[in-house]
Amino acid sequence: MILRANALLFDNDGVLVDSHAAVDKAWGILGEEFGLEGFSISNHYGTRAQDLVLKLVGEEKFEAANNRINELEQSSADETNPLPGAHELLHSLTAGIWTICTSANGNLGRARIKAAGLPLPEQFVSGDDVANGKPAPDPYLLGAKKLGFDAGDCIVFEDADAGVKAALAAGAAFVIGVSKRALETDADIVVEDLAGISFDGKQLVIPEAKILRR
């Protein structure tokens, strides 16, 4: 499959890096400490931590809970590995045609990318950089703007429902869901992983064998 666009915007966790075990553990501890009975972070992947914390504990406990989840996630940032195809694809891309738009705060996002041995883009969008996190379109609108493009010139790679909603709301040219988890989203196309995918600045080539849904 060939798709035409001028730039690529990547979510990080679940698309480029595998951090879910560390994320699940950190939020599990937070849930125990703050009495969040029955809470599972798996239902909220892709959501900015500060937004979720406020929703879960309210304003009175927000500062303590937000500081705690930041501490827990930062301490486990090195428990991160690259997902299939991420290393090869990112290292093949020239500067200025790709960036990462993560819901994580800047320090955490960069730490996970570094731990996975992946390159950092010249431009980078974290949850700290936008007024509204995913599923609002802000992260992808800003990512495209930093590269000098409209969102409609960009292809977005996402794994979580909140992120897919953000990309669609931003008006991305295509939204590619990554992993079987993305089959539950409204992504335009869903692929198994990034292995074998290539981009020359004009055309994205996806191996047919990697496509789970089109």
Model-derived regions: residue spans:
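Small/polar loops that bind or transfer phosphate-bearing groups
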Residues: 18-19, 45, 100-101, 158, ...
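A generic structural signal for short
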Residues: 15-16, 78, 98, 128-129, ...
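Proline-centered loop/turn at the N-terminus of a beta-strand
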Residues: 97-99, 174
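Asp-based, Mg2+/Mn2+-dependent phosphohydrolase catalytic module
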Residues: 1-6, 104-214
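Residue-level marker of regulatory loop/turn positions in helix-turn-helix DNA-binding domains and
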Residues: 82, 101, 132
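N-terminal helical cap/lid subdomain that shapes the substrate entry/recognition surface
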Residues: 2-94, 105-110, 118-119
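Short, surface-exposed connector motifs at secondary-structure boundaries
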Residues: 91-97, 148-151
